[in-house]
Amino acid sequence: MAQHSVEMILMRQLADYLSVPVVLMDTTGTVIFYNEPAEKILGVRFEETGPIDRKEADRLVELSDDPAAASCDAGHPLDIALGERRPAHSHRLMLRRTDRVRLQIEVTAFPLIGQEGKLLGAVAMFWERPGP
């Protein structure tokens, strides 16, 4: 992560200590890190993938709106965090891994803003949603 800002490096360090699944994304949509709890849900270790560009991430993990979700839940929190520079939460998204396992998840994402208001990336925390 030598070419990343200090803030992004510190966020990666913090994510490594958290028990909640965390994905760290830069402004181009490249996943630059995900922690061990995220590996368990995503079904692949970060050591195996390394940083993942947006196209490859979409191939590895498919996110879609849950048809049962309310309209206020529409949208993907990471896209909102990066595009609108504000935090966002989705109560119901469907995640499908490359092994075809489908999980209903909740996602909270927020932008990382550096000095002078510069957008550095975004962080998503997510977890499997129990029940319907």
Q: Would you name each region that the model predicts?
A:
Residues 112-132:
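Sensory coupling linkers of modular signal transduction proteins
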Residues 42-43, 50:
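PAS-family sensory domains
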Residues 26, 65, 97, 114:
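Short, acidic, Ser/Thr-enriched surface-loop or helix-capping motifs
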Residues 48-95:
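Terminal output helix/cap of sensory domains in signal transduction proteins
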Residues 89-94, 101-107, 123:
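PAS/PAC sensory module
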Residues 35-42:
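N-terminal capping loop/helix in small sensory signaling domains highlighted by a polar->aromatic N-x2-3-F motif
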Residues 31-32:
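Conserved hydrophobic beta-strand signature of PAS-family and PAS-like sensory domains
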Residues 2-27:
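Sensory modules in modular signal-transduction proteins
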